[in-house]
A protein has these predicted regions:
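Short beta-strand scaffold segments in enzyme catalytic cores
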Residues: 81-91
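RNA-binding accessory domains that recognize and position tRNA/RNA substrates
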Residues: 49-50, 88
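Short, basic/aromatic recognition patches
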Residues: 55-79
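Phosphate/diphosphate-binding glycine-rich loops and adjacent basic-rich segments that engage nucleotide
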Residues: 196-205
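N-terminal mitochondrial targeting presequences
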Residues: 36-49
């Protein structure tokens, strides 16, 4: 499945137009309904590496597909207490080879479903995930480790997960394994999908 060139004609998010001066892990806040949540990202200063942290038009198109998948279970409470998450695996030849979404609490997250569909084609591919991959053992194993074990080369994350059990840990694990990570692709839309989740986690945290 290949995206047409027309789907790449999307504008780059304004907050990614800024050019930082060095590699750094930062936090920023986003206000909603009187509450704030923290999102962790990594920015790279002016160099050949800088473009790697900026979502491309193709990245945005694939992320929008992942967002659409995340809405499959239904309304905001359909996966309660978990967030709604979608994942798309794209091969080096720009083909979608796996897709998945989290259907409900207690079942696998989006990433394992997408990786299962991709099989061996996941090796060297890019994973588009609407929310930072989890990094802890709960009802399921860490999705960050599943991506590593599958041989994923690059991960594009829609928005960080403010859950104290994750909160940057998934991104850190992926980077430690040598995987390129881009954070903040279609961030606003990814936030809106799980607005209730973000508010609840922030309030309880």
């Amino acid at each position: 499945m290949r995206l047409e060139a027309a789907s790449r004609a999307l504008a780059r998010p304004a907050h990614y137009l800024r050019t930082p001066t060095l590699i750094q892990q930062i936090s920023w806040t986003k206000k909603t309904l009187g509450h704030r949540h923290r999102v962790v990202a990594v920015r790279v200063g002016p160099s050949d590496e800088a473009e790697k942290t900026v979502p491309s038009d193709a990245d945005r198109a694939y992320m929008n597909r992942a967002i659409d998948l995340s809405l499959t279970p239904g309304g905001p409470m359909s996966t309660y207490p978990n967030p709604r998450v979608g994942c798309v695996i794209v091969s080096a030849s720009d083909e979608i080879v796996g897709e998945g979404y989290h259907p409900r609490a207690g079942l696998p997250h989006a990433e394992p479903y997408a990786l299962r569909g991709a099989g061996q084609l996941a090796r060297g591919a890019t994973a588009y995930v609407t929310l930072e991959p989890c990094d802890h053992y709960g009802r399921t194993a860490p999705c960050s480790q599943a991506l590593i074990d599958a041989g994923i080369r690059r991960v594009v994350v829609g928005i960080g997960d403010p859950n104290p059990l994750v909160d940057g840990g998934g991104i850190a694990r992926l980077r430690k394994a040598g995987i390129e990570v881009v954070v903040g692709c279609e961030e606003d839309r990814c936030f809106d999908v799980n607005k209730e989740f973000f508010e609840r986690i922030t309030k309880n945290g």
